[in-house]
Curated annotation (Swiss-Prot):
Stretches with biased composition (Acidic residues): 76-89
Protein name in the entry: Speedy protein E5
Organism of this sequence: Homo sapiens (Human)
Family the UniProt entry places it in: Belongs to the Speedy/Ringo family.
Domain of life: Eukaryota
Length: 402
């Protein structure tokens, strides 16, 4: 019984403490009252200090109040910021696509929503070290200027070849019939006045003058072939001052190769420049003999009679010319002179052969400089002749010879 009484007493003291702590205290009192049990009572203010009210109770505020406070703060900040404008959707308009008399065909076209403000915003978001004002084209132009300066320096050391631009194509009206018009594709000629000046300058060369006077039959130098020479000058892409005598003959040989089927006419150019090559005559005679032998199978049987015929021809000539014995002593001298003459001709033949090979090599290089465009249309030839129709070269027409 003593234990139960002590327990009830302790419980009563605890309840008294709780009741006294809950009672309101007067404001003029500075010190709290002491309980009869001897335990000090603490003054608790709910607004300032959050102390434990009872054992086992968590004094922290609930999670809902903290989340609600965060939501209130987020709502206050969002209220201060302006509302974000949504991008307008692209509009669609109707534009006129085709007019046909009183009928009109419309086409639906979408309008782009991109504004200048978007470009400014994009430029402002670039890196701070990047200048958005100059376009990329200026940087490329700077590279081109640097390359041009380097090329000018290299031009002083070695001349740079300028490639000729390819001819452009345009559409011209060929025929008009009422309200209908027929179009035809036509190439624009690249012949410039400077090419005519280079051609006229070469005509004053004494070698070219002798060549034109030598070709009386106009087999290799009529007006159309000479007009093709000017067209080739424009396509080769060389400067006008760079064309020399060799370029005239190269272009003329190439023009004959394109237009003429006669191989002898092209060989006449070699005959005039380097002389007739007589070193090929023995080879031609040998081939001619082989061809005749293949055509006549009986030539082998007659071959055994050749020494007998030579012997009889010699005897006949000796009997007809009694002075043959006296002239016999001159044979070694004649043989010696003939050998010297043949040797000098062989040296010239070797020289001429090397020059012809060099000419053919330069002709191929000239053909490559024109990018293989050796064909010239009749319309372009007429345009070239119409530039100066009173020129004396255009009077070299084969029709006037007959």
């Amino acid at each position: 019984m003593d234990r139960t009484e002590t327990r009830f007493r302790k419980r009563g003291q605890i309840t008294e403490k709780i009741t006294t702590s809950r009672q309101p205290q007067p404001q003029n009192e500075q010190s709290p009252q002491r309980s009869t049990s001897g335990y000090p009572l603490q003054e608790v203010v709910d607004d300032e200090v959050l102390g434990p009210s009872a054992p086992g109770v968590d004094p922290s505020p609930p999670c809902r109040s903290l989340g609600w406070k965060r939501k209130r703060e987020w709502s206050d900040e969002s209220a201060e910021e302006p509302e974000k404008e949504l991008a307008p959707e692209p509009e669609e308009t109707w534009v006129v696509e085709m007019l046909c008399g009183l009928k009109m065909k419309l086409k639906q076209q979408r309008v782009s929503p991109i504004l200048p403000e978007h470009h400014k915003g994009f430029n402002s978001q670039l890196a701070p070290g990047v200048d958005p004002s100059p376009p990329h084209r200026s940087f490329c132009w700077k590279r081109k200027m640097e390359w041009w300066d380097e090329s000018e320096e290299s031009l002083e050391e070695e001349p740079r070849k300028v490639l000729a631009p390819e001819p452009e194509e345009i559409w011209v009206a060929e025929m008009l019939c009422g309200l209908k018009m027929k179009l035809k594709r036509r190439r624009v000629s690249l012949v410039l006045p400077e090419h005519h000046e280079a051609f006229n300058r070469l005509l004053e060369d004494p070698v070219i003058k002798r060549f034109l006077a030598w070709d009386k039959d106009l087999r290799v130098s009529d007006k159309y072939l000479l007009a093709m020479v000017i067209a080739y000058f424009s396509r080769a892409g060389f400067p006008s001052w760079q064309y020399q005598r060799i370029h005239f003959f190269l272009a003329l040989y190439l023009a004959n190769d394109m237009e003429e089927d006669d191989e002898d006419s092209k060989q006449n150019i070699f005959h005039f420049l380097y002389g007739k090559n007589r070193s090929r005559i023995p080879l031609l005679r040998k081939r001619w003999f082989q061809l005749g032998r293949s055509m006549n199978p009986r030539a082998r049987k007659k071959r055994s009679r050749i020494p007998l015929l030579r012997k009889r021809r010699f005897q006949l000539g000796r009997s007809m010319n009694p002075r043959a014995r006296k002239n016999r002593s001159r044979i070694p001298l004649l043989r010696k002179r003939r050998f010297q003459l043949g040797r000098s001709m062989n040296l010239r033949a070797r020289k001429n052969r090397s020059q012809i090979v060099l000419f053919q090599k330069r002709r191929f290089q000239f053909f490559c400089s024109m990018s293989g465009r050796a064909w010239v249309s009749p319309e372009e030839l007429e345009e070239i002749q119409a530039y100066d129709p009173e020129h004396w070269v255009w009077a070299r027409d084969r029709a006037h010879l007959s």
